[in-house]
């Protein structure tokens, strides 16, 4: 079934059918006649034809660093909610925190017909920025502050600062820290700097406390905690850069006969599902990941509709969750 055939059956011009399909100006009488024929014939416009007419594919590219992380499903839920309402398809790619793979994905989306790209970024290298600059569509960054593109992110620095201040408030003087790679400006560098500032205010030098690095997983958190214990240093409180790392650290401590929070007070950050199913519940910081997905989707649609729209930077709030582990 073609537009010409629909037009002939409805007794209107092909141009009238095209205006109907694109929500253009049309008399109510013609609109009703066309709608009746479309319903009777179960006509579905060709996606290719629609793209040729509107120059829009109704497809959005999305890249996430780790599909099974605590944050990615929430971000995707927010994006999907908005895109479903606007009849957009989401083309999802998962880089598994592999930088070379992520760069290849950007190259793929350069060659694909998408109306916009949402990048949930953990690292933004010069190669990332070069490839993003070659995109022929709007770009929105989630999870990192970025001057070059519209972005949605959390205040990792302030959240980490507040949590470390809380851990030290009860008289603890032997803190430790398990972070992630500081090339990740949000979870790595800014959380580290927030902790460092809180320690400085307590007259503790960050470089003198036991520190380890993990890679966002429970197992790596467990291994990092084991390395901290092997130093023999006294630790009475521990800040972990993610909830999953914190759960791994707690698992290790229990295997070594230590109790949380009686022996060591522990906090994470992010407030994923694991924080609340743990016993006792994990002290953490609630980040609004679903909201970040909603906001990113709205920003990309705004830029698709108005390519000249100014870039926007949106920092979301957070909520301290003082629960059972600290």
Locate predicted features.
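Flexible loop/hinge segments that line or gate small-molecule binding clefts
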Residues: 120-162, 182-183, 244, 270-282
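Periplasmic-binding protein-like
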Residues: 114-120, 176-179, 211, 232-242, ...
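Short beta-strand segments enriched in small/hydrophobic residues
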Residues: 14-16, 52-68, 166, 174-181
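Hinge/beta->alpha junction and helix N-cap segments in small-molecule ligand-binding domains
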Residues: 64-74, 92-101, 152-162, 178-226, ...
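Central regulatory/effector-binding core of bacterial HTH transcription factors
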Residues: 81-126, 130
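Flexible loop/turn connectors
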Residues: 226, 230-326
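N-terminal helix-turn-helix/winged-helix DNA-binding helices
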Residues: 1, 39-77, 85-88, 96-98, ...
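N-terminal helix-turn-helix DNA-binding module of bacterial transcription factors
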Residues: 1-58
């Amino acid at each position: 079934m073609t537009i010409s055939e629909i037009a002939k059956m409805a007794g209107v011009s092909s141009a009238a059918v095209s205006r109907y399909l694109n929500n253009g100006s049309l008399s109510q009488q013609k609109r009703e006649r066309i709608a009746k024929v479309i319903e009777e014939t179960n006509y579905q416009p060709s996606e290719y034809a629609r793209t040729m007419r509107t120059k829009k594919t109704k497809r959005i590219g999305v890249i996430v660093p780790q599909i099974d992380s605590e944050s990615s499903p929430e971000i995707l839920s927010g994006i999907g909610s908005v895109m479903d309402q606007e009849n957009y398809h989401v083309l999802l790619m998962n880089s598994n925190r592999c930088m070379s793979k992520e760069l290849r994905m950007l190259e793929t989306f350069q060659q694909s017909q998408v109306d916009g790209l949402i990048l949930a970024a953990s690292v933004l290298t010069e190669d990332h920025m070069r490839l993003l600059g070659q995109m022929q569509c709007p770009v929105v960054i989630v999870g990192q502050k970025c001057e070059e593109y519209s972005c949605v992110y959390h205040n990792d620095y302030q959240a980490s600062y507040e949590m470390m201040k809380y851990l030290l408030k009860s008289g603890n003087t032997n803190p430790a820290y398990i972070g992630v790679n500081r090339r990740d400006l949000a979870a790595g560098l800014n959380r580290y700097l927030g902790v460092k500032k809180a320690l400085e205010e307590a007259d503790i030098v960050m470089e003198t406390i036991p520190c380890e690095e993990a890679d966002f997983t429970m197992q790596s958190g467990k291994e990092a905690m084991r390395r901290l214990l092997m130093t023999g240093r006294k630790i009475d409180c521990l800040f972990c850069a993610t909830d999953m790392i914190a759960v791994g650290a707690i698992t290790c401590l229990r295997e070594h006969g230590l109790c949380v929070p009686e022996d060591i007070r522990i906090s994470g950050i992010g407030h994923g599902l694991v924080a609340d199913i743990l016993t006792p519940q994990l002290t953490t910081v609630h980040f609004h990941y679903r909201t970040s997905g909603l906001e990113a989707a709205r920003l990309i649609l705004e830029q698709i509709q108005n390519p000249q729209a100014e870039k926007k930077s949106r920092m979301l709030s957070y909520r301290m969750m003082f629960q059972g582990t600290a």
